[in-house]
Amino acid sequence: VYPQAAVDPLDGSNSWLHKAPTAHNDVNFIEAIIDTLSNNYNIDNDRVYACGYSEGGIFSYELGCRLNNRIAAFSAISGSMLVDAFRVSYYNLGNCSPIHPTAVLLIPGSADSNPHSTYSGFQPYYMSVNEITTYWANHNNTDTNPIVTPISNTNNSDGSTVEMRIWKNGDNCVAVKELKVINGDHDWPGSFGNMDINATQEIWKFLSKYDINGLINCGLTSSIEINESEIQIFPNPTSQHLSINGINEKNLNYTIYNSKGELVINGVLNSNKFSVDISELESHIYILRIGNFSYKIIKE
């Protein structure tokens, strides 16, 4: 769902938050959208996510702060988080006040020079990335120190690389994850800027593991370990068979759901090179779930 921002009366631009003071309440607008979708479609209200780019990233933080009872997890790309003092003094919004452990994914660029998304922050208005991750790591009670992993530099011509930083073991198994684009600008990786990662795919892979209660199946013990980086799902789109490679554990359940959340196919992966016949499905978008991971597939 892509909400349309209202026109700012001062400069004619589309903005999620009109210049103060204003009678507009964008958070109430988003809540009304969620209510409307819930009343008309079979959505899972425990798995409502938010994501945004630039000012949309700032707004995603606001939803995480002010509509936390409806937002399971969220992601922000090239957008910062308002400093509480600025939020209170200028916008009269009150402090950020999340009420449940909330998984957060940030994808910032270290060379982003926009005032509202610079990596080092823009005091006293916008927090730095380090301040943001510290805030959510503290709120979620995660490990103090992140696990830092370099991402393969698969594209040498984009002028940037990616470093993954993840704070694990939060309450209800939630995590805070940063995909730092080193030398990255005000970009959406995978579409423009860095090409080592695809921001759209990274967002869904991360958020879809959580619901309003935290990590789905948190606390369940299992001997099965899935290395998501080794999973290959192709061709996608497809009209006949979908190949699933890289699952090294046998007898792992998989499920496919339609856009209404209805189960349409399920089975067991009994080989590390498995094929699923989806030829009988209607041409549409579906969700494949393997363990805690979800993937969008397109039936032609």
Mark where each language-model region is:
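Serine-hydrolase catalytic machinery in alpha/beta-hydrolase-like enzymes
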Residues: 1-49, 53, 62, 66, ...
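Solvent-exposed loop/turn segments at secondary-structure junctions
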Residues: 6-10, 54-58, 79-83, 110-114, ...
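Extracellular/periplasmic catalytic domains that process cell-envelope and extracellular macromolecules
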Residues: 42-44, 51, 55, 66-69, ...
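Short glycine-enriched nucleophile-adjacent loop
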Residues: 57-68, 78
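The feature captures the conserved acid-bearing segment of alpha/beta-hydrolase catalytic domains
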Residues: 72-73, 78-148, 153-160, 167-171
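Alpha/beta-hydrolase-fold serine-hydrolase catalytic core, especially in secreted/extracellular enzymes
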Residues: 102, 137-224, 262
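C-terminal outer-membrane/trafficking sorting elements
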Residues: 225-300
